[in-house]
């Protein structure tokens, strides 16, 4: 790892945010009831979306809750790029059903909507009140996040992205209190993801890792996570797209996206996400694809200031850089990103 502390955070205090407990592996979703009970939850609101319902994943989870004789309520109307209206509707269900905890089931949209409910349940007001950094004052209800995609890492982050329907912008809420208490990444729940979604979420994870790695807030801890994430994405994403039933590839991508989440949750993101969020908020475009399309262009822009880092990215992504100058090696990273994107079928542009 090529980290020069003198050029980073020597002498400064840094922080590292992750869930209290994380479960990864085939069948770990069966532990939802026991984990929820261990943190004080008795009747959760399950926040999910129609895609999860139609795929039969919600029934898989409710069967687990039923077997444990755990009561629950369901909000299944979350949309891609969840809105302030989604949060308000879900919170009404939470109150009406007298829930005391939250289980989010899905990808980034369901997790973000559920986090929004957590803000209102713990602190009151409207979701708009929490736009910005660490605006909440009181704890969340007990919260278990169950992931079904390998990309957003929302099941383990302190980020909550909600579309403000009046302004047509995505509100960025960054708050350590919305970090789930328990994160669950069960590759069994990801087997049915179609190739296009697998590709988009996987490239979202790569974007997280790359942006965190070249961030001015990067630390040795985030570097370690970002490097391993990029290595695993390069090893497993093509396989997961080609064969969704490839258990090793699915589990590899579980780890990859989680590691990328650990990186960006603590080193933050960059211009790719800044632009992708606005495309999602204004045009309702899919987040993962926007990131994948923008990543090579923003990386080329950033490359001139971080050549050595991009040279390292090139090597992690399988490029041979022996004998090349720092500039030449850094260009190989852009080529590797483009190749991976093309290999998994990401569109070449936004049109």
Regions found by a protein language model. Name each.
Residues 29-32, 54-57, 84-85, 109-115, ...:
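Short glycine/serine/threonine-rich phosphate/pyrophosphate-binding segments
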Residues 85-188:
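Glycine/threonine-rich beta-strand-loop-alpha-helix active-site module
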Residues 1-75:
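An N-terminal, well-structured beta->alpha segment
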Residues 53-126, 239-250:
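N-terminal small/polar loop signature for handling phosphorylated ligands or for N-terminal nucleophile
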Residues 282-351:
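Gly/Pro-rich interdomain helix-loop hinge
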Residues 151, 258-291:
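Glycine-rich phosphate/pyrophosphate-binding beta-alpha loops
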């Amino acid at each position: 790892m090529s980290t020069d502390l003198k050029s980073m955070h020597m002498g400064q205090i840094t922080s590292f945010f992750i869930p209290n407990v994380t479960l990864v592996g085939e069948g770990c979703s069966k532990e939802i009831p026991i984990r929820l009970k261990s943190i004080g939850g008795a009747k959760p609101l399950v926040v999910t979306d129609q895609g999860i319902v139609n795929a039969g994943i919600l029934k898989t989870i409710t069967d687990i809750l039923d077997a444990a004789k755990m009561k629950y309520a369901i909000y299944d109307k979350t949309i891609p790029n969840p809105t302030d209206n989604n949060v308000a509707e879900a919170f009404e269900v939470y109150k009406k059903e007298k829930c005391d905890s939250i289980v989010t089931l899905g990808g980034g949209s369901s997790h973000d909507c559920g986090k929004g409910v957590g803000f209102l349940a713990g602190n009151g007001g409207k979701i708009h009140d929490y736009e910005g950094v660490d605006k909440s004052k009181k704890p969340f209800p007990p919260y278990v996040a169950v992931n079904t995609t390998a990309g957003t890492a929302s099941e383990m982050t302190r980020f909550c992205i909600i579309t403000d329907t009046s302004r047509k912008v995505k509100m960025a809420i960054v708050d350590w209190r919305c970090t789930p208490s328990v994160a669950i990444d069960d590759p069994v729940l990801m087997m049915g993801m179609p190739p296009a979604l697998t590709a988009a979420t996987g490239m979202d994870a790569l974007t997280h890792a790359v942006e965190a790695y070249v961030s001015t807030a990067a630390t040795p801890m985030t570097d370690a996570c970002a490097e391993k994430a990029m290595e695993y994405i390069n090893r497993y994403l093509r396989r997961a797209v080609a064969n969704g039933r490839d258990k090793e590839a699915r589990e590899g991508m579980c780890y990859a996206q989680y590691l990328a989440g650990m990186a960006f949750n603590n080193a933050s993101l960059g211009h790719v996400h800044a632009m992708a969020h606005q495309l999602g908020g204004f045009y309702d475009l899919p987040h993962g694809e926007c990131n994948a399309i923008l990543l090579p262009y923003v990386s080329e822009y950033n490359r001139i200031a971080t050549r050595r880092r991009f040279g390292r990215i090139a090597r992690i992504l399988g490029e041979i850089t022996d004998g090349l100058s720092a500039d030449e090696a850094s260009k190989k990273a852009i080529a590797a990103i483009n190749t991976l994107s093309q290999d998994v079928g990401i569109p070449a542009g936004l049109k």
